[in-house]
A protein has these predicted regions:
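Conserved acidic donor-binding segment of nucleotide-sugar-dependent glycosyltransferases
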Residues: 304-305, 309-316, 325-330
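Short hydrophobic beta-strand element within catalytic cores of glycosyltransferases
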Residues: 289-292, 302
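A short, well-ordered alpha-helix in the C-terminal region of glycosyltransferases
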Residues: 318, 325, 332-362
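N-terminal strand-loop element at the rim of the active site
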Residues: 7-15, 19-71
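A conserved mid-protein helix/loop that constitutes part of the nucleotide-sugar donor-binding site
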Residues: 18-23, 188, 192-214, 223, ...
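Short His-centered aromatic/hydrophobic patch
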Residues: 93-99, 117
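Acidic anion/phosphate-binding donor-loop and adjacent secondary structure
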Residues: 143-147, 154-155, 162-180, 186, ...
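Aromatic "clamp/platform" in nucleotide-sugar-dependent glycosyltransferases that forms part
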Residues: 253, 272
Length: 372
C-alpha cells in the first residue's frame, strides 16, 4: 500500500504551524508513512528527519513577507509534478492559502484532501477552502468550522496537538543561559514567545509592564519577548515610550525557546486570537504555567486557578494584576506548573497526536474516510 502523503504549508519560518508540520512529518516516518513536505524554505526545514523529502515552493515572495499570484501558479505546477512523480495519495494542507492550493491540486489529480485548521477566524469565509476531512486543533475550532463554515460534523475531527517534552536543565545549564543572555543571577524572568504580529497583541503586554513599572512592582524582573514580525519596530518604540526598556528584552525568533523556558519563572500569552498555542504545551512539559488570554482554545488547556491563569484579552490592567499576583506567590506558580505538566502528560503527548492523525490517513487508505 502506497503511504505517500504530501504535507503542505506556506513557509518553514519559526512558528506554530511550521513546528506542527515538522513534528507530524517526523512522527509519520517513524510509523511507516512516506511524508513529503512542501513549503517556502526556512529555518525549520533543518528539523525534518533526513528521510523526508522537501519541496521548496515559491509561495512567499523574495522579501519573505507576502504571497503573490505568480507564486501560487508556480507552486501549483510544481505540486502537480511532485504528485505524479511520487505517487502521492493524500494531500494534507495547513493554513488557508495552502488549503486552497491543496484543494485545487487534489481535485485536478483526483486525490484525497485533508486540512488542519489551526486558528479561530471570521474574515474571508467565502475564500476558505478546507479538505474532505478537516482536523481541528481544539474543540472551539471544531465548533467554529461546523457553525460558521457549514462543515458537517462527521467531516471535522478534533485532534489536540502533541509534542515531545522539553528537557529540564540542571542548575549549571541554567546559569549558562543567564550568562549567555547577560542577565544577573536571581533576576525573575517572565517569558512571552510568539510572532510579533497583531494577533499576538504584545501591545497589551507592554502596556501591562508599564503599569507595573509605575506601581514600582517589577524591580529585578525582566520580560523576555521572543519572536520576529512586522510589529517589532513599533513595539520597541512602545517600550521606550512606556519607559520599560530596563525591564524588556527582545530575542530573535530563532532563539532557543527551550533554554528560555527553563530559566523563566512563568509565561505570558496576550493574544486576541488563538487555536491552541504550542507555547503553552512547551512550557507545561517542564512544569511552567502561563498567564493567558481567554481566547480560542486556550481555556481547553489553561484552566483558571488550576493549570494556569486566564485574563480577558486587550486588558492591560487585568494582565498586570495577574502578573503581580504570580510574582508575589511563587508557591502558586509551582502548584500551577505541576498541574499543567500533569494535564500535558494526560492529553497532549506526541504519540497521541501522531497516532490519532495516522488513524485519519488509514481511514482513507482503507476506504472508510470521514468525508461524505
Amino acid at each position: 500500500m502506497n503511504k505517500s502523503i504530501l504535507l503542505l504549508t506556506d513557509e518553514m519560518n519559526p512558528g506554530g504551524v511550521a513546528r506542527h508540520v515538522v513534528d507530524l512529518a517526523n512522527g509519520l516516518v517513524e510509523r511507516g508513512f512516506q511524508p513529503i513536505v512542501a513549503a517556502t524554505d526556512g529555518p525549520f526545514r533543518a528539523r525534518l528527519d533526513e528521510q523526508i523529502a522537501f519541496v521548496n515552493l515559491p509561495i512567499l515572495a523574495r522579501d519573505g513577507t507576502h504571497k503573490s499570484l505568480i507564486g501560487f501558479l508556480a507552486s501549483y505546477r510544481i505540486l502537480n509534478e511532485v504528485v505524479r512523480r511520487e505517487k502521492v495519495t493524500i494531500i494534507h494542507s495547513h493554513k488557508r492559502y495552502t488549503d486552497l492550493l491543496g484543494r485545487i491540486v487534489a481535485r485536478r489529480m483526483s486525490l484525497s484532501h485533508i486540512s488542519t485548521c489551526h486558528n479561530i477566524f471570521s474574515s474571508l469565509k467565502h475564500v476558505s477552502f478546507f479538505g474532505d476531512t478537516t482536523i481541528a486543533c481544539s474543540k472551539v475550532v471544531q465548533e467554529m468550522l461546523i457553525r460558521d463554515f457549514g462543515k458537517k460534523m462527521q467531516d471535522v475531527i478534533q485532534i489536540y496537538y502533541g509534542i515531545l517534552p522539553f528537557r529540564e536543565f540542571n542548575k549549571k545549564e541554567k546559569n549558562q543561559v543567564f550568562k549567555a543572555l547577560s542577565i544577573s543571577a536571581g533576576t525573575k524572568i517572565i517569558a512571552s514567545v510568539g510572532q510579533l504580529i497583531e494577533s499576538k497583541d504584545r501591545v497589551t503586554l507592554v502596556r501591562a509592564i508599564g503599569i507595573l513599572r509605575k506601581r514600582g512592582e517589577i524591580d529585578n524582573v525582566l520580560f523576555a519577548i521572543l519572536g520576529d514580525g512586522e510589529q517589532k519596530t513599533m513595539l520597541e518604540e512602545l517600550v521606550r515610550n512606556e519607559a520599560v526598556h530596563d525591564h524588556v528584552m527582545f530575542l530573535q525568533g530563532t532563539s532557543n525557546v527551550e533554554a528560555l523556558f527553563n530559566v523563566a519563572d512563568f509565561m505570558v500569552l496576550s493574544s486576541i486570537r488563538e487555536g491552541l498555542p504550542y507555547v503553552i504545551l512547551e512550557a507545561a512539559s517542564i512544569g511552567k504555567p502561563h498567564i493567558a488570554t481567554n481566547v480560542g482554545g486556550v481555556s481547553e488547556f489553561v484552566i483558571h486557578g488550576e493549570t494556569g491563569v486566564l485574563v480577558p484579552p486587550n486588558d492591560p490592567e487585568k494582565l498586570a494584576d495577574a502578573i503581580k499576583d504570580l510574582l508575589d506567590n511563587p508557591e502558586k506558580v509551582d502548584l500551577l506548573g505541576t498541574s499543567a505538566r500533569e494535564k500535558f502528560l494526560q492529553q497532549f503527548t506526541y504519540d497521541k497526536f501522531i497516532d490519532r492523525t495516522g488513524e485519519v490517513y488509514k481511514d482513507y487508505f482503507t476506504g472508510h474516510s470521514h468525508a461524505s
